[in-house]
C-alpha cells in the first residue's frame, strides 16, 4: 500500500455520503506497498480501507478484483469485503481516480516470519487456490514471463546505475525463462503478491489475507514460488530451509503438488525472483515526486536470484523427498 494521490477531508466526506457507513471521523494515508493510494478511514460506525487505483492499474481489471474478494469470502477465505454504495455500486471516483472501499481486516503483519507462520501461510495459500475454483471472471498475469522484457526495457540504460553488471544478469535470465518457462501445470486464481505485509495474524494465528490487486490466473506453483521468495529468506539473504519446509508442508497438506510442479519449482522460484527484481528496479528508478511511498530495494531480489540459480532441485527448498 502507498499514497500517490492526496484526498482532502472535505472531498472524502462528500464521497462517503454515497455509502451507509456513517460519517468521517478521521483518516490517514498508509505508506506500505507500491501500487495504489490507500487510506485507513474511521467513520462513526467502523474502520475501512479506501483504495484509489493509480495509473498502472487497468480500470477494466477492477471488476475482477472486487468480484474475487467477494467470491473468496463466500468460499471461506478471510479477506476484505468490498462495501457497496446505497445504490449497490462497488466502484466510485475520488480525486480523479477510480476507487473502492473495503472492510478493515483486524490483525497485524509479521516482519520476521517464523516457521510456524510459514506453515500457516502455506495452508492458507492452498485454501485460496482451491477456493478460487468457480470464479468466472479471468485476468491474465501481466507480470508473468511475457511481461518481464518490457519492464527491463523500461529501466533501460539506467539499470547498471543500480548495480554494475545487473543488465547482463537480467539479459541472461530473460533468455533462459523465455525459452523454457513451464506451461502445462495446474493453474487457476492466484494471489501473486502474498508477501508478509499482505497476511495478518492475531495471537500467532493467521487471520486473513489482503491486497488482491495483483491477483490473476496463472500457475499455482508459481504462487508457491512467490511465497518462498517472500517468506523464507533471512535479512542477511540466506534461504531458511526450515521455513521453506514448513511452508511447503502446509501447502501440500491442503493441496498436494503434482510431480511436474515439484520439478518446476526451482525455475518458478528463480523466475519469481526476477519478476520482483524487475518491478522493484522500475519503481526504484521512477519514484513520483512528493509521493508517500517507500521504494523497495531491487538488490534484495538479485541476492535471491543468485541463490535460485544454484538450486539443484526442490529439495533445496525443504521439500520432503
UniProtKB/Swiss-Prot annotation:
EC number assigned by the record: 2.7.1.39
Gene Ontology biological process terms from the UniProt entry: threonine biosynthetic process
Domain of life: Bacteria
Biochemical pathway: Amino-acid biosynthesis; L-threonine biosynthesis; L-threonine from L-aspartate: step 4/5
One Gene Ontology MF term: homoserine kinase activity
Entry keywords, A to Z: Amino-acid biosynthesis, ATP-binding, Kinase, Nucleotide-binding, Threonine biosynthesis, Transferase
CDD domains: HomoserineK_II
Reactions catalysed: L-homoserine + ATP = O-phospho-L-homoserine + ADP + H(+)
SUPFAM superfamilies given in the database record: Protein kinase-like (PK-like)
Pfam families for the chain: APH
Disulfide bonds listed in the record: none
Family of the protein in this entry: Belongs to the pseudomonas-type ThrB family.
Descriptive protein name: Homoserine kinase
Encoding gene per record: thrB
Amino acid at each position: 500500500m502507498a499514497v500517490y494521490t492526496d484526498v482532502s477531508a472535505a472531498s472524502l466526506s462528500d464521497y462517503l455520503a454515497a455509502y451507509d457507513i456513517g460519517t468521517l471521523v478521521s483518516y490517514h494515508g498508509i505508506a506500505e506497498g507500491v501500487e495504489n493510494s490507500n487510506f485507513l478511514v474511521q467513520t462513526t460506525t467502523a474502520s475501512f480501507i479506501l483504495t484509489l487505483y493509480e495509473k498502472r492499474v487497468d480500470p477494466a481489471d477492477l471488476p475482477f478484483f472486487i468480484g474475487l474478494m467477494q467470491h473468496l469470502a463466500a468460499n471461506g477465505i478471510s479477506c476484505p469485503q468490498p462495501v457497496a454504495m446505497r445504490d449497490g455500486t462497488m466502484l466510485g471516483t475520488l480525486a480523479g481516480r477510480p476507487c473502492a472501499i473495503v472492510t478493515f481486516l483486524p490483525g497485524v503483519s509479521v516482519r520476521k516470519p517464523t516457521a510456524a507462520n510459514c506453515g500457516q501461510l502455506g495452508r492458507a495459500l492452498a485454501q485460496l487456490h482451491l477456493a478460487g475454483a468457480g470464479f468466472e471472471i479471468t485476468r491474465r498475469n501481466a507480470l508473468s514471463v511475457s511481461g518481464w522484457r518490457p519492464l527491463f526495457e523500461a529501466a533501460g540504460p539506467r539499470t547498471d546505475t543500480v548495480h554494475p553488471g545487473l543488465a547482463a544478469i537480467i539479459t541472461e535470465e530473460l533468455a533462459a525463462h523465455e525459452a523454457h518457462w513451464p506451461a502445462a501445470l495446474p493453474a487457476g486464481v492466484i494471489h501473486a503478491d502474498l508477501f508478509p505485509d499482505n497476511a495478518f495474524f492475531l495471537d500467532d494465528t493467521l487471520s486473513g489475507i489482503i491486497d488482491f490487486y495483483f491477483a490473476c490466473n496463472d500457475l499455482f506453483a508459481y504462487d508457491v514460488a512467490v511465497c518462498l521468495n517472500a517468506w523464507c529468506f533471512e535479512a542477511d539473504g540466506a534461504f531458511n530451509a526450515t521455513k521453506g519446509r514448513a511452508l511447503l508442508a502446509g501447502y501440500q497438506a491442503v493441496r498436494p503438488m503434482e510431480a511436474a510442479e515439484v520439478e518446476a519449482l526451482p525455475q518458478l522460484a528463480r523466475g519469481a525472483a526476477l519478476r520482483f527484481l524487475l518491478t522493484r528496479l522500475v519503481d526504484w528508478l521512477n519514484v513520483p515526486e512528493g509521493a508517500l511511498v517507500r521504494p523497495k530495494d531491487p538488490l534484495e531480489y538479485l541476492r535471491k536470484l543468485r541463490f535460485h540459480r544454484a538450486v539443484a532441485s526442490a529439495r533445496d527448498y525443504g521439500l520432503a523427498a
